[in-house]
């Protein structure tokens, strides 16, 4: 997260750092005591041959995020967090996750920066119009939290991160809630929405 600060230790209890054999890979979000969302592995299994639900070791320090009961409202102040780089043009990974407040933007504001982006992509745009606060490389899979609910999953955005007029793009969790609940319940045959 660029333009943010170190997260308070109690506010990132659902945020995880995912490592592979070569080191840090990306952020992820805990959505129940056993299921971890990693952006490419959980929300888009149709695009991958290997649908992974990663095992989580329970502890009193882990608190999953609530799935949304309704979509977020444009203008909402939302919280982003992640283990990604904290500098926009070079990779500077922090020792603790960083957080920032950004605003949920109208689709029209998003279309200015991203002509190919539309409602059919089941996404949300959030950021600060003047730039300076944004998720960045390594934050993918982390949460966009609005009113205490897990509304978005960090997906993609501009390079360099935090560029004015180019907000971050997030997978809209509300559109996948029924499918996520089916997967959590053990229904591996559930079909991911297009």
From Swiss-Prot:
Regulation: Completely inhibited by the serine protease inhibitors NPGB and PMSF, partially inhibited by benzamidines, and weakly or not inhibited by SBTI and EDTA.
Hydrolase in keyword set: yes
Modification comment: N-glycosylated.
Keywords assigned: Disulfide bond, Glycoprotein, Hydrolase, Hypotensive agent, Protease, Secreted, Serine protease, Toxin
Compartment(s) of residence: Secreted
Tissue: Expressed by the venom gland.
Temperature profile: Optimum temperature is 30-40 degrees Celsius.
Chief subcellular location: secreted
PROSITE patterns, alphabetized: TRYPSIN_DOM, TRYPSIN_SER
pH-dependent activity: Optimum pH is 7-9.
Catalytic site positions: 140
Limits of the Peptidase S1 domain: 36-185
Coiled-coil annotated spans: none
Cysteine pairings via disulfide bonds: 7-99, 44-192, 78-146, 110-125, 136-161
The protein's assembly and partners: Monomer.
Other comments on record: Negative results: has no fibrin(ogeno)lytic activity, no coagulant effect, and no plasmin-like activity. Does not inhibit platelet aggregation. Has no proteolytic effect on dimethylcasein and insulin B chain.
Primary role: Shows kallikrein-like activity, releasing bradykinin from kininogen. Also activates plasminogen, which is also a plasma kallikrein activity. In vivo, lowers blood pressure after intravenous injection in rat.
Family: Belongs to the peptidase S1 family. Snake venom subfamily.
Protein's UniProt name: Kallikrein-like enzyme LV-Ka
Organism: Lachesis muta muta
